Amino acid sequence: MSNLRIFAVNQKKISSLHYFNNMCSSKIRASLKRLKLHVLLGRNYSSLPGLIGNDIKSLHSIINPPIAKIRNIGIMAHIDAGKTTTTERILYYSGYTRSLGDVDDGDTVTDFMAQERERGITIQSAAVTFDWKGYRINLIDTPGHVDFTLEVERCLRVLDGAVAVFDASAGVEAQTLTVWRQADKHKVPRICFLNKMDKIGASFNYAVESIREKLKAKPLLLQLPIGEGKAFKGVVDVVRTEKLLWNPNSDDGKDFERKPLLEMSDPKLLKETTEARNALIEQVADLDDEFADLVLGEFSENFDLLPAEKLQTAIHRVTLAQTAVPVLCGSALKNKGVQPLLDAITMYLPSPEERNYEFLQWYKGDLCALAFKVLHDKQRGPLVFMRIYSGMLKPQTAIHNINGNCTERVSRLLLPFADQHIEIPLLTAGNIALTVGLKHTATGDTIVSSRSSALAASRRAKREGEKKQKENNEAERLLLAGVEIPEPVFFCTIEPPSMAKQPDLDHALKCLQREDPSLKVKLDPDSGQTVLCGMGELHIEIIHDRIKREYGLETYLGPLQVAYREAILNSIRATDTLDRTLGDKRHLVTVELEAKPVETSSLLPVIEYAASVAGDLSQASREAFENGVHSACLQGPLLGSPVQDVAVTLHSLVIHPGTSTTMISACVSRCLQKALKKADKQILEPLMNLEVTVSREYLSPVLADLAQRRGNIQEIQSRQDNKVVIGYVPLAEIMGYSTVLRTLTSGSATFALELSNYQAMNPQDQSTLLSQRHGLS
């Protein structure tokens, strides 16, 4: 039985063996001891000898613990709020790492890509598995940079709970709002951790108020800080009326003590904590009827007598219902408050069985999983992160991909430890692991055990659909909600060092696209050049860097350009005929259509059929027409940018017998392009939400600079000693802004960007842009 397999020989692998060693019975520990010796001797050892009977059951419970003991969580926040540092401390205190990683030193576990370690930011979410007090925690560290919003979206899709990390001196920041909205969309329960309580300017009350005001959430204060800024030395457990103090002489924060608050020694702190606990009890009672009955009945006279366990259970229910969010505090960098955060994760966030996933009823215990991330490994090929919702997955078994309608074989299952992986013999519901051997599975694909299982689930969904909705919707309901991929806002050309290297570049880009669906690659039809489309300057830069590091290709990037869109302003009709003979076969088709603007903002064209043709069209002809429309809308007449906010109506389609659907599509595309050229047109440019945090002394030059960039200031807020400028600015005007802002403010300011919408350019700016693009200025 191949229970565990070691793929590399290094110190971190030995660390992971220590981790398993701590959880096993004596016989398994002896086996692991022998295995560790083999690793130290440099051997690739494939099985654990001596695992029999109950020991194998013990190993099974280690690899796949009871579902009630599993927590699938993510850490999310604004950039620089301390997500990765918090993750590193969590791993250290859980016993999964043997030393403290530091973002500034570039030795963190979850930031495993070279670019991440150099830049001090998290780009790809690294999944890590560890145990804490009998619970299995699958933790995913997500990026806070706006260019990597898709990574956050991708991971929230498979989480059961999340920890939102805040900088206690800044409160809710721009990217926090974005991630919070994403968590709301996926109905992910969460708890808040006010980090950096040791930082100068840290304010617990300010941070809590910003959660209440900006996130419209109801904070449950489970802790109070003991001191703020440099005076921060511990926290008060409001639920248990205890104080937690960390030993100032302890280097790693493991040495702390929990003491009850007493009237004699802490009268002021006890009074403050009692008031906070009473307020917490009243708040939870307002949100949970079961708890309200308990409080009003047995403990109405004296809240002090209410057992902490009863309050914790009620907080757990409220958190799951997402009617409020527990709030804790600490300083990950100073090693304070992380262990109580781990306790809160197991206590208040849900297990997989506590989340209500409606689609599980259709699978009746069969395998149902979601592929939520793809990585490429040089030795093992594609590694697919998989969340198992029901059933079981084993190595050397076939699976069916519903999205791709294909069958593949899983060769291995791996337990992820950032870029370190341990092979496991099976994976049960609620768990997250890596699969090896899936060549065609991509991000967002739904995985089941077989095609027959998918058909059986489809029949059950259809029966349910007949009760609740139209029959033609049940097929879509079979697919798990995939990952919403945003449209790119930047693009540039990319060239290999020589034409001989073009196939290598194509392969690298294909692999990177499978890993990162927000990266789009297309071929410029005029120049024949390869074009990269991405979410921001940093995104494109990282891709360029990865091609060099991972694929050994020195590529050349063209100038970074903004991804504009086009729209028409009036209705226009056009007719076209395509008459072509290929071999001895004549293809003849005539089409008449109308293009008109629509008010709803959509990149996809609205396709309509006039009553005179709607009943006569075959399904193949409809598909050919729609393919032609979509093809024409990819390139507008002004800049070759996508055309949005357009409706296309088919009025007539005359097809000569034997005409291929490809020719029909070509004729429709040419006809629609003719209509678009005749219509009045405008260019739409991406508008970015902008938030600049700057000290008072530099506010004026920052505002003056934004005015020159066509910026529109909506609000200027005060945040401690800083000013926060909130507004929006065209993306074209903000390229390279980080360098300018650094110069204007002597490096003291920060900013965050997020795509707001696409807005019509004024005629003067549009004329200038067209002149620049066509080489007239």
Swiss-Prot record:
Enzyme Commission number(s) of this protein: 3.6.5.-
Entry keywords, A to Z: GTP-binding, Hydrolase, Mitochondrion, Nucleotide-binding, Protein biosynthesis
Location in or out of the cell: Mitochondrion
Enzyme kind, highest EC tier: hydrolase
Primary location group: mitochondrion
UniProt superkingdom: Eukaryota
Gene Ontology annotations of biological process type: mitochondrial translation; ribosome disassembly
Binding residues annotated for GTP, in chain numbering: 77-84, 141-145, 195-198
Pfam families: EF-G_D2, EFG_C, EFG_III, EFG_IV, GTP_EFTU
A GO cellular component entry from the record: mitochondrion
A GO term for molecular function: GTP binding
PROSITE patterns: G_TR_1, G_TR_2
Parts forming coiled coils: none
Residues covered by the tr-type G domain: 68-353
Known catalytic reactions: GTP + H2O = GDP + phosphate + H(+)
Family the UniProt entry places it in: Belongs to the TRAFAC class translation factor GTPase superfamily. Classic translation factor GTPase family. EF-G/EF-2 subfamily.
Function: Mitochondrial GTPase that mediates the disassembly of ribosomes from messenger RNA at the termination of mitochondrial protein biosynthesis. Acts in collaboration with MRRF. GTP hydrolysis follows the ribosome disassembly and probably occurs on the ribosome large subunit. Not involved in the GTP-dependent ribosomal translocation step during translation elongation.
Note: This protein may be expected to contain an N-terminal transit peptide but none has been predicted.
UniProt-recorded name of the protein: Ribosome-releasing factor 2, mitochondrial
Record organism: Bos taurus (Bovine)
Gene symbol of the encoding locus: GFM2
